[in-house]
Amino acid sequence: MGLAELRDRFPVLDTCLVQVQALLDPRRVLLAPEDQALHLAWRTQDRLEMATIDLPPDLCRSGQPLNHQVLGETIADLLLEKGFSLPQVDIELLLPLSSCEWRLLEGAAATALSCGDDLRVLQPELGWSLSLQDCYLDILTLQQSDSALVVGTERQLLQAWVDTLQEADLPLRRAEWLLSAAWRGLFDVHAGADQRLVWLVEQQGRWRLLLLRNGFPE
């Protein structure tokens, strides 16, 4: 009995085959949302592909989803339009520029940080609007450096994106701030360079200027 005949007799096999295919060949897709648009990026065999869809004003505001179901369906529809099988997709979320804050920490205490709880114990004065106890923290440390970057975002905002992707039955592989992801790439390109760099970042028609010394923002 051939596979086609088995699938005709036992339709549940289609679901099983899709699940097996998702495990054997997951597709990594970057999702970079803005208030006005969604951006997707993924790699094929020979190049990087991208897709963008405009959003109505009532779906996302200040980086936070307002309608989980509709926004989730919009993401799923765009993936299907680009030929993806949803069970195969692993989403890597790049949080919008306006949704996070970061600070540079220096010294022995900074290099000893391994997670957000370590920072909460120290209770440093970071001078940002987030509460250390109520936000999600990511610590970015680098080898052969006495500095670390701490990135924070509201737990409510991150959970809203988790809920949105769940509405579309899409697994969230990881989440990272768009700016820190871009910074890591820039740091790798200029690794070991003892110089200062001026980094211009466009944000909703406005420019953000960052000064980098030895790879770290001043």
What do the predicted segments below correspond to?
Residues 2-7, 11-53, 85-87, 128-218:
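Small-residue (GG/TT-enriched) beta-loop-alpha framework at ligand/catalytic clefts
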Residues 30, 92-94:
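Short, well-ordered beta-strand segments
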Residues 38, 59-60, 99-102, 206:
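Short acidic, S/G/P-rich loop/turn micro-motifs used as interaction or catalytic elements
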Residues 50-82:
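N-terminal phosphate-binding loop and adjacent alpha-helix
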Residues 57, 68-69, 83-84, 95-149:
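Internal amphipathic helical hairpin motif
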Residues 74, 118-125, 160, 164:
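Amphipathic alpha-helical segments that form well-ordered structural scaffolds
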Residues 81-91:
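N-terminal glycine/serine-rich phosphate-binding loop of ATP-dependent small-molecule kinases
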